[in-house]
């Protein structure tokens, strides 16, 4: 166990002798023994002993000491005002953080100030907006040994549950949601989570079926969870959320009423994009920088105006649809918004004024929202009628837009309550007054009037006293220690009236008060204190009334999110000349297809067609490196993803089948941490494809067998081609440098050859990036190597060897070097297989080193 966690041994040994404050700290460390306890002392959060040493090291802050009758303890603290950035650092270092706040004012405490853990901060249970990405969900997952999977975003209340068949399915599903933390039960697999996911073993009792079912029903009522594994996962996840919620600063348990809707789903209802496909197609993260920062599909599509829309878009991308009717409904909505430019632009302008409604109402429900949050919520709800008006016409042309419009509820009573109760520009603090609007509460107005009248009397006092005493230099002032006073300089002390009572002596003056001034001051203080208390009570009451409308506000938030995504997709379609695809076609038919990301970064992008009928679903694609093979295959795959997302696609015309899965085998890389070579990684990915691909799959293969010898590589490539043709029947795009494979494809009845042509010029090779029927005539590998800067001697020798092979029809292994030595079999194959678009500078240097060593 980490020494920074749990009760400090040095304190535990002297538990009976510790001061009350350190005893309180020790008790909290025992209760939250899996977290670093940040213990509020005044304006700082303090840590002690081993926790202090760890905190000081990680946060690079000073390690001090606290002396006590029982000894001296290391201590390190952080200012409360900057706590969030420090907490983020502790989370990044792999720690959970229990924040223990003072839940009563120090001046109100009769003895030891009461403290309670108001929140347990973990990577998966964050609710602090400054620590969360606006456009991304922050999920905590829970996995059971029966492959029950539940996911919860504590910041929004989004909750999902499903049951998976096997470990591989778990890994794929986790790739979809990318949880920041995973809660696992006894015997559950733990090797399927990403490197950035904190794995948290949780207490066995939370996974017991009866307790889990009771908890699930308490949150969601009678549920449609189909298996015990799902119930256990969901129940345990809710238990973990309860553990992390802590208490409010009022000492009350933080409610989680906003977690009220459970989405039970079947992964088979959505297109499966596994981890390899998501990375290869650059759905969320770019593998290369195409001259544009953030060049991934999601950024290309993300014209959303709100955080709600940004998260919804990513959810749609995680789960493209398989149901043709649902896809068509989305496409109908996008088309209606494409055609109604003015309505769409007005809606987008108003969506830009929308705050994060989901996280706002969640904060309200948890009792964490301040007055500014309520004003932001009111401001967002006030936009809703205008959004609804933008859809008056379009809703008649789209069932989905009609549904969105119907669900856009401006919650009039909530808006009016907030507007009536909360001032327009409230302060950050909600306990120090200035939050509730005048006229909202009669008693509060009376107290404020008393306060104002008293201060007005004091404002006039200085002039009155100067006139009464004849002391022109007399001043009336105030400070936090002595309150209100009348100050008279030493030369004028003889003129001080008898009713002046001394309050403070200074070097050059005396400060006094009068009975009437004291009385007025007491009235002001009493009015201020009672007004602050009453104002906070009224604010909490308003917040609770707003919280009662949580479900209505959440439904509006979901409708706003959908509208934002549909407007974004329509904007992209209109701006970049996308077309509406035909769904559920019997083949892939695309005219003028383009890559949605690459076309934005290249001024002369060349569109290409695709013609793959169901009767000939396999295409073998040849051509030199840099000719466009990889980009072309990815754009076909992305066209399918976009179609099933419900988006228009970058093409003149497009008709595609509905694919239940997209497989990719693109590029080459070692898995050093996993102890796997490039070739082993490649074969593992290929095995997954061949095991699962069928007639409803789209397979993209960019070189197979490149990580081994030429003969072995070709044998694997041919066997793969034949298997995909004869057994799987999947729609397949197979790019290869094995030109012999084109002869195989020519003999297969359900396969076609395509190629990207190139021509030799005085400057090397010229690519036209046009896809054409038939096989390529040459690979131009030597020419591309020359363009890449391979040493002239290597290029010349390779050209000489290639010429000899062509004239003698000699295989690479039989060609001899000029000095009678034997040329390594892989030399020419490596040159031909160099893919400049995939090669980093370091890889290029390593390649040159290998070639030189082979020649030597």
Curated annotation (Swiss-Prot):
Keywords: ATP-binding, DNA damage, DNA repair, DNA-binding, Nucleotide-binding. It comes from the Archaea. It comes from Natronomonas pharaonis (strain ATCC 35678 / DSM 2160 / CIP 103997 / JCM 8858 / NBRC 14720 / NCIMB 2260 / Gabara) (Halobacterium pharaonis). NCBIfam families: mutS1, PRK05399.1. Disulfide bonds: none annotated. One of its GO terms (molecular function) is damaged DNA binding. This is DNA mismatch repair protein MutS. HAMAP family: MutS.
């Amino acid at each position: 166990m980490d020494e920074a966690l749990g009760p400090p041994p040095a304190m535990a040994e002297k538990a009976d002798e510790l001061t009350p404050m350190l005893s309180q700290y020790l008790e909290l460390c025992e209760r939250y023994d899996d977290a670093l306890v940040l213990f509020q002392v005044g304006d700082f959060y303090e840590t002690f002993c081993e926790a202090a040493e760890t905190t000081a090291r990680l946060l690079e802050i000073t390690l001090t000491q606290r002396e006590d009758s029982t000894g001296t303890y290391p201590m390190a603290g952080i200012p409360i005002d900057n706590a969030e950035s420090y907490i983020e650092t502790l989370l990044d270092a792999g720690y959970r953080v229990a924040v223990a706040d003072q839940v009563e004012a120090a001046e109100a405490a009769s003895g030891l100030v009461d403290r309670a853990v108001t929140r347990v901060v973990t990577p998966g249970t964050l609710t602090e907006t400054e620590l969360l990405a606006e456009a991304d969900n922050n999920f905590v997952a829970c996995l059971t040994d029966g492959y029950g999977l539940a996911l919860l975003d504590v910041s929004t209340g989004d909750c999902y549950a499903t049951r998976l068949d096997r470990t591989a399915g778990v890994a794929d599903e986790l790739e979809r949601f990318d949880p920041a933390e995973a809660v696992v039960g006894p015997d559950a697999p733990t090797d399927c989570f990403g490197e950035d996911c904190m794995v948290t073993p949780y207490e066995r009792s939370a996974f017991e079926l009866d307790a889990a079912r009771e908890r699930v029903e308490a949150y969601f009522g009678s549920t449609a969870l189909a298996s015990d594994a799902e119930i256990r996962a969901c129940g345990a996840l809710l238990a973990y959320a309860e553990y992390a919620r802590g208490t409010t600063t009022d000492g009350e348990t933080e409610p989680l009423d906003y977690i009220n809707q459970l989405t039970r789903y079947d992964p088979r209802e959505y297109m499966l994009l596994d981890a390899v496909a998501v990375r290869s197609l650059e759905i969320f993260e770019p593998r290369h920088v195409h001259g544009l920062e953030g060049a991934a599909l999601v950024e290309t599509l993300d014209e959303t105006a709100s955080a709600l829309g940004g998260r919804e878009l990513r959810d749609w991308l995680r789960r493209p649809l398989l149901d043709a009717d649902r896809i068509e409904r989305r496409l109908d909505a996008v088309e209606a918004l494409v055609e109604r430019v003015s309505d769409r632009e007005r809606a987008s302008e108003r969506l830009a004024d929308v705050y994060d409604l989901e996280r706002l109402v969640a904060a309200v429900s948890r009792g964490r929202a301040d007055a500014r949050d309520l004003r932001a919520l009111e401001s967002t709800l006030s936009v809703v009628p205008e959004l609804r008006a933008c859809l008056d016409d379009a809703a008649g042309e789209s069932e989905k837009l009609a549904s969105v419009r119907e669900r856009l509820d401006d919650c009039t009573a909530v808006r009016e309550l907030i507007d009536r109760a909360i001032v327009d520009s409230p302060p950050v603090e909600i306990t120090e007054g200035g939050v509730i609007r005048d006229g909202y509460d009669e008693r509060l107005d009376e107290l404020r009037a008393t306060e104002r009248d008293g201060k007005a009397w004091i404002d006039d006092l200085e002039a009155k006293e100067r006139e009464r005493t004849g002391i022109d230099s007399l001043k009336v002032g105030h400070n936090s220690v002595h309150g209100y006073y009348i100050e008279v300089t030493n030369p004028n002390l003889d003129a001080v009236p008898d009713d002046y009572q001394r309050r403070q002596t200074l070097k050059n003056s005396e400060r006094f008060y009068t009975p009437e001034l004291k009385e007025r001051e007491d009235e002001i203080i009493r009015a201020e204190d009672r007004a602050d208390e009453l104002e906070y009570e009224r604010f909490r009451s308003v917040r609770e009334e707003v919280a009662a409308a949580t479900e209505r506000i959440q439904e509006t938030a979901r409708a706003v999110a959908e509208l934002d995504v549909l407007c974004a997709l329509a904007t992209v379609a209109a701006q970049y000349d996308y077309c509406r695809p035909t769904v559920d076609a019997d083949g892939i038919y695309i005219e003028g297809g383009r890559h949605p990301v690459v076309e934005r970064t290249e001024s002369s992008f060349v569109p290409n067609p695709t013609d793959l009928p169901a009767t000939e679903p396999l295409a073998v694609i040849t051509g030199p490196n840099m000719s466009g093979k990889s980009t072309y295959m990815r754009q076909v795959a992305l066209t399918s993803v976009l179609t099933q997302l419900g988006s228009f696609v970058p093409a003149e015309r497009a008709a595609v089948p509905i694919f239940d899965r997209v497989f990719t085998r693109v590029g080459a890389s070692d898995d050093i941490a996993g102890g796997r070579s490039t070739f082993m990684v490649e074969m593992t990915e290929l095995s997954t494809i061949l095991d699962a691909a069928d007639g409803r799959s789209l397979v993209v293969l960019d070189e197979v067998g490149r990580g081994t010898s030429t003969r072995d590589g070709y044998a694997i490539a041919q066997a793969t081609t034949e298997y995909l043709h004869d057994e799987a029947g999947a729609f397949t795009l197979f790019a290869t440098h094995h030109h012999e494979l084109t002869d195989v494809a020519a003999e297969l009845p359900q396969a076609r050859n395509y190629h990207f042509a190139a021509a030799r010029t005085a400057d090397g090779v010229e690519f036209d990036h046009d896809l054409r029927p038939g096989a390529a005539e040459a690979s131009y590998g030597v020419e591309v190597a020359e363009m890449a800067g391979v040493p002239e001697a290597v290029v010349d020798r390779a050209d000489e060897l290639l010429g000899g092979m062509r004239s003698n029809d000699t295989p690479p292994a039989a060609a001899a070097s000029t000095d009678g030595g034997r040329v390594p079999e892989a030399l020419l194959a490596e040159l031909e297989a160099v893919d400049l678009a995939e090669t980093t500078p370091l890889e290029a240097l390593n390649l040159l080193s290998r070639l030189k060593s082979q020649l030597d």
